């Protein structure tokens, strides 16, 4: 097995160590390996391929980190073919939330979510995906 060196904030390293201890992992490498496998597998759901999808992506970031908001604006414009709607809101005194409603194919939605997740200084990125042809099951 190869060895990969990664950089991360001390606080995240401590959280990983605590998580490993509390959940019976042998160490942080095992936690990171599982997290990477899960992340990579998220968009490998064959049931979503070749279908029209809608997605909601929620991004939380610190109000003081103005570069995140600017990057979200650029992503919205760069992916305007799939961004159906975008909403910005203040959460408490310190945070901002950016919400995107997307419509498109899995590959395009995956690329968008990946770029949002790769944006430095985001605190949380959450999303859900639903095939548009399944909407009728709710009526």
Curated annotation (Swiss-Prot):
Signal sequence coordinates: none
Cofactor: binding comment: Binds 1 nickel ion per subunit.
Keywords: DNA-binding, Metal-binding, Nickel, Transcription, Transcription regulation
Gene3D superfamilies, per the entry: ACT-like. Chain A, domain 2, Met repressor-like
Keyword Transit peptide: no
GO molecular function, one term: DNA-binding transcription factor activity
List of residues binding Ni(2+): 77, 88, 90, 96
Keyword rRNA-binding on entry: no
Cofactor: Ni(2+)
GO BP terms: response to nickel cation
InterPro entries reported in the protein's UniProt record: Acetolactate_synth/TF_NikR_C (IPR027271), ACT-like_dom_sf (IPR045865), Arc_rbn_hlx_hlx (IPR013321), CopG (IPR002145), CopG/NikR_regulator (IPR050192), Ni_resp_reg_NikR (IPR022988), Ribbon_hlx_hlx (IPR010985), TF_NikR_Ni-bd_C (IPR014864)
One family name in Pfam for this protein: RHH_1
Family, similarity comment: Belongs to the transcriptional regulatory CopG/NikR family.
Protein role: Transcriptional regulator.
PANTHER family cross-referenced by the UniProt entry: NICKEL-RESPONSIVE REGULATOR, NICKEL-RESPONSIVE REGULATOR-RELATED
Protein name: Putative nickel-responsive regulator
Species assigned in the record: Haloarcula marismortui (strain ATCC 43049 / DSM 3752 / JCM 8966 / VKM B-1809)
